[in-house]
Amino acid sequence: AWVCGNSCVWKGSEKTPLCAIACQSIWNEVSSEMNLPSGLSIIISGGRDLGEKMSEDKRIPVMSATGSTKMGKAVGTKVASRLGRSILELGGNNAMIITESADLKMTVTAAVFGAVGTAGQRCTSTRRLIIHESIYDRVCGAIINAYKQIIIGSPLDTRNHMGPLIDLDAVNNYLESLKAVDKKGGKFLLIGKQLEGTN
């Protein structure tokens, strides 16, 4: 929207309101330095009900949403019912293609960070690797070795590579996904366990 000169009213996830506020603060600072008109970016904060109201609002000609396929179907249907347009990024299983000539060190760093950065909870997290068969074993070995070095803990501690999942629902969804992989005959290259903490 901004690149095309349009204003944008946006709502972040209700699970991460402080991240949305921080992003808006950065936008405010940059737009002020660039002498852009105020009001190009407006944040609103709330839950699912607010998102539903936005999808029903005829003053919003184009609605963009990122999230689950279930959410996207609901948003797309509501926006279409008022003849609005929608852009939906849904339930992605983002793939990274690793070619025969790939730089192995760079590839492993990108693949692992893409998967564990923000504990794999962003819409662009690496979920699948499509690896050229000639380097498959080397890539798998290097990734297993990299995962063995991941330090999990408080995201406020810069020595850690990965923080916790955002809430119990996220933990349960993750565990269910692992069960589904096992049930479908998937092979685990590295076995871990759910961590427990004091708080």
List each language-model region with its residue ranges.
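ALDH superfamily catalytic-core signature
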Residues: 29-30, 70-199
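Rossmann-like NAD(P) dinucleotide-binding subdomain of oxidoreductase/dehydrogenase enzymes
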Residues: 1-106
